[in-house]
């Protein structure tokens, strides 16, 4: 008699949780990290100190991971109809809804504990930041461009970085916000929102056929045949906003080199998405964090030369 085939062991809870928070896909939290750290350096006029660097780096990773838990719970009925997401732990039933929410809550509380080591204004800003992050998955049901909601969520680290550096007097009202977060910091937020629109529209282009069938809204569907043109316009607005503000703040040659490196990558991304292939669009999205890194590196080097 032939031996019965050995049954594969089910994945451990730790393995499932790692899948839930996309631990093997750091591109997601890197997309949040570079603009947040860029704002931190600009707010401080250079190196912001190890404490704030640790708070915002760890906080970014934790909140992005918590966001994955919330997103997978909210989208579980949709995800089973999408090729790319059908095997996510919550969608396939390997992790329960309550379990995923518990993991997300623990991660969010850990991030909040880090925020508590900053100041009152930054703590206050963390609440609307959380609200927007929670709202994003549900925006896909009723907003034509839900990527704009994601753009606000992914950009909220910018005003929080300024408040952490400049809002240390204990006040947390509107006057304190205006004093700690200048108008040009909000300009950085708006510019970064356009970057999010660019790369998340590329991401939405991957799933467009599936999304049309299940009836959710995305920027790729809303933009239709103008999607590639719109993505390139979003990139240009992002680089224009950050470039104008950076030069206005006195950044020079190194920052210009960072912008140029980012622009070269954007031009390459156009070659990846112009035919709207799934593989090309997904590759452009997956490598997009290098665009943000180029801008961040230009800021760091330029401010470092001043020191």
Curated annotation (Swiss-Prot):
Alphabetized UniProt keyword annotations: Cell inner membrane, Cell membrane, Magnesium, Membrane, Transferase, Transmembrane, Transmembrane helix, Ubiquinone biosynthesis
Primary location recorded for the protein, binned into one broad class: membrane
Pathway this chain belongs to: Cofactor biosynthesis; ubiquinone biosynthesis
GO CC, alphabetical: plasma membrane
PROSITE patterns registered for this protein in UniProt: UBIA
EC number in record: 2.5.1.39
EC main group: transferase
Reactions mediated catalytically: all-trans-octaprenyl diphosphate + 4-hydroxybenzoate = 4-hydroxy-3-(all-trans-octaprenyl)benzoate + diphosphate
Cofactor: Mg(2+)
Annotated InterPro entries: HB_polyprenyltransferase-like, Prenyltransferase, UbiA_prenyltransferase, UbiA_prenylTrfase_CS, UbiA_sf
GO biological process: ubiquinone biosynthetic process
Family named by the database record: Belongs to the UbiA prenyltransferase family.
Name of this protein: 4-hydroxybenzoate octaprenyltransferase
Organism in which the protein naturally occurs: Methylibium petroleiphilum (strain ATCC BAA-1232 / LMG 22953 / PM1)
Gene name as annotated: ubiA
